Amino acid sequence: LAERHERPLAGVFTRWYAALRIATTGPEEAAEAAYRDAAVRLEGCGMPGLEHGLPPLALLSLRVLHRRPARTGEDADWGPYEPWARPLVLLAEGRRTAAAAALRDVPEPPRDLLSEALWCLTAPAAIAVGDRETMERAQAELSPAAAELSAGSGLLTVGPVSRHLDDLAAALHIPSSPKTS
């Protein structure tokens, strides 16, 4: 359909959405393969905001979704998402002090379709280094989206926002919010 109507980007977005669906319902390995396949379609698509940064961000989100550390030793092009990825990568490298310093420099995420995902990446880093102020900010920013899947972008997810809120509540020693459906 995309080819027939000369809309090549439709195929890019449907491939990314398919990878997202696998990430939410399938095994981690299948989701990683789907994201890597979708990333190939970004090359030269004319959308630098997606081409630079999105592929490694999707893989990092998948690892956080499965409660696994960031990959290290890779020369990832984090693009505009580098500030949110850096603390998790440093933690995976065993560099807790550097991760805490990087976390202090993390800006507020842009108020866009990836805002919740970026907060869901910030939250476990804040928990890991015991940064209460950042945990409280993440909790306040994520609370309105408690019943949602993080990142309504159709491209990636870090899982249910409620799970991240539960983790934050446990770390902050406050009661979890009641589940909404």
What are the residue ranges of the model-derived segments?
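Helix-coil-helix junctions within alpha-helical repeat/solenoid scaffolds
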Residues: 1-181
